[in-house]
Amino acid sequence: MSDNAQLTGLCDRFRGFYPVVIDVETAGFNAKTDALLEIAAITLKMDEQGWLTPDTTLHFHVDPFEGANLQPEALAFNGIDPHNPLRGAVSEYDALHAIYKMVRKGMKDSNCNRAIMVAHNATFDHSFMMAASERASLKRNPFHPFVTFDTAALSGLALGQTVLSKACITAGIDFDGNQAHSALYDTERTAELFCEIVNRWKRLGGWPLPMAESDSDSDSDSEE
């Protein structure tokens, strides 16, 4: 059995990165000026055979930061009333502090050295999380500052679909459009989708990678 056949740990699979699925709901498209209203995070785990599955979930409704823009079109789209006291919203600091604490524990348990965001159209979610972290003065942000795993791009490659709902359906994952644009629901579906893409690549023989030819073998071949 090759050494690569033993690469079934999460840290081995993603070069030391610890993938965490994130989705946000916001009051606009500008991460610097528009409010972050909801965020969900799901960590992932890998079993002894190298199969990836969702693990731990955190979900928060978030109070708009002071002076935040609330675009009416965005609120109409996601159906969030930022001023509804029944939301049980917390500050950006409290939400991200709890998520980062969960992520750092997962990194330690998995022997990973950096978290990497998994998201659908990840640039959007990444920009809002980073802006909120800066506003909250959170110094120990475990996420890579710019590298992400974007399931829109991965789904386009693996499934021929880039829209979350269509990619899920193509992958055999149930998707309820009535629950879409909830950060929790979209994170759950994105986590299932990412795991399916990673596991499908394994089922097709793409992982572990074939062992590279050793230097000694290369030298002996060149002498023949």
UniProtKB/Swiss-Prot annotation:
One matching Pfam family: RNase_T
Q: Where is the Exonuclease domain?
A: 20-194
Q: In which family does this protein belong, per the annotation?
A: Belongs to the RNase T family.
The record's annotation in NCBIfam families points to: RNaseT
The free-text note explaining how the cofactor binds reads: Binds two Mg(2+) per subunit. The active form of the enzyme binds two Mg(2+) ions in its active site. The first Mg(2+) forms only one salt bridge with the protein.
- Where do the annotations place Mg(2+) 1 binding? 23
| Reported function | Trims short 3' overhangs of a variety of RNA species, leaving a one or two nucleotide 3' overhang. Responsible for the end-turnover of tRNA: specifically removes the terminal AMP residue from uncharged tRNA (tRNA-C-C-A). Also appears to be involved in tRNA biosynthesis.
Tell me which GO cellular component terms the UniProt record holds: cytosol
**According to its UniProt record, which residues of this chain constitute the active site?**
181
Which key words are in the record? Exonuclease, Hydrolase, Magnesium, Metal-binding, Nuclease, tRNA processing
Q: Which domain of life is it from?
A: Bacteria
* Gene Ontology MF, one: 3'-5' exonuclease activity
Binding positions for Mg(2+) 2? Answer: 23, 25, 181, 186
Quaternary organization: Homodimer.
Q: What is this protein called?
A: Ribonuclease T
> Lineage from the top down?
Bacteria, Pseudomonadati, Pseudomonadota, Gammaproteobacteria, Enterobacterales
Its EC number is 3.1.13.-
User: What does the entry give for GO biological process?
Assistant: DNA replication proofreading; tRNA processing
Q: Which InterPro entries match?
A: Exonuclease_RNaseT/DNA_pol3, RNase_T, RNaseH-like_sf, RNaseH_sf
Cofactor(s) this protein cannot do without:
Mg(2+)
- List the residues marked with site Important for substrate binding and specificity: 29, 77, 124, 146
Q: What class of enzyme is it?
A: hydrolase
Chain's gene name: rnt
